[in-house]
A protein has these predicted regions:
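Intrinsically disordered, metal-sensing/regulatory segments
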Residues: 1-260
Length: 260
């Protein structure tokens, strides 16, 4: 595993860590409008990454293998949606600004369930980076070094506000700054771990690469629709979330087309 791949795997985690560090510099919890802006931006990045970095390469890869391109894309996408739906149903977690936890009944602390909610969010992102770099490692023609880096960088950019979104509310819940920072960092640790595991098993998953790429896309779109869009539209009406969604979408689209 070369330095390029190691950098790509660590970039998203560094984005979360940097965002979590905001708890040391900001005195007050993020305002509702700021949370909307950050959630909108993250949703835009994830949606664009799902299309340009995952679904389109999945279809191109399937076509190169002599398969009907839409079948792996559709099947993998649905597997990703159903997988996140299963995790969402089983794992106890608490979304930002929510009073009632989701998942199986649990006596876990509110702060723990808040971290679990963001951790669920980060699972498909880690898988997406790992799958793309696994394809690059094995010389898959549809995977370029620039495209893989664009995906990792795009996720790192949207992880920065996510780190702040988790650490600041933890601080507001009464946690010490160091503990709030640690919670944010912990929520992002699943990304490099998941990406590394994907690469370690890359020789086994290579034939299923089109399905896995679209699987990651389906999981990411599930997170956007189930978690981020409600955050954008919650409370008093505002267009700022939609504007920031568009900004995030165009940033990720530009990154992928420029570097890919």
């Amino acid at each position: 595993m070369n330095n390029e791949i190691i950098t790509g795997l660590l970039l998203p985690f560094l984005g979360t860590t940097a965002g979590s560090a905001c708890v040391f510099f900001m005195k007050h919890e993020l305002s509702r409008n700021v949370q909307r802006m950050l959630a909108g931006f993250a949703a835009g990045v994830m949606t664009a990454a799902s299309v340009w970095s995952l679904i389109i390469p999945a279809m191109e890869l399937a076509e190169g293998m002599g398969r009907l391109s839409f079948i792996p894309a559709v099947a993998g996408f649905w597997f990703g949606v159903l997988f996140l739906l299963l995790l969402d149903t089983v794992i106890p977690h608490l979304h930002m600004n929510a009073e009632k936890a989701e998942g199986v009944p649990s006596k876990l602390a509110r702060t723990t369930m808040m971290v679990l909610a963001v951790t669920l969010h980060n699972i498909p992102e880690g898988m997406a980076v790992g799958i793309v770099y696994a394809g690059l490692l094995h010389g898959t023609a549809e995977m370029s070094s620039g495209g893989a880096f664009a995906l990792a960088l795009g996720i790192a950019i949207q992880n920065f506000p996510e780190g702040a979104i988790i650490s600041m509310p933890l601080r507001a819940e009464g946690k010490k700054k160091s503990a709030a920072f640690g919670g944010g960092v912990l929520s992002g640790a699943v990304e490099p771990a998941g990406a590394l595991l994907t690469i370690l098993f890359s020789s086994l998953i290579l034939p299923a690469m089109p399905y896995l790429l679209s699987f990651a896309a389906g999981a990411m779109i599930y997170v956007v629709v189930e978690e981020l869009i409600p955050e954008i539209s919650e409370g008093e009406h505002s267009n700022i979330g939609v504007i920031m969604f568009s900004v995030g979408f165009t940033v990720m689209m530009a990154l992928d087309t420029a570097l890919g």
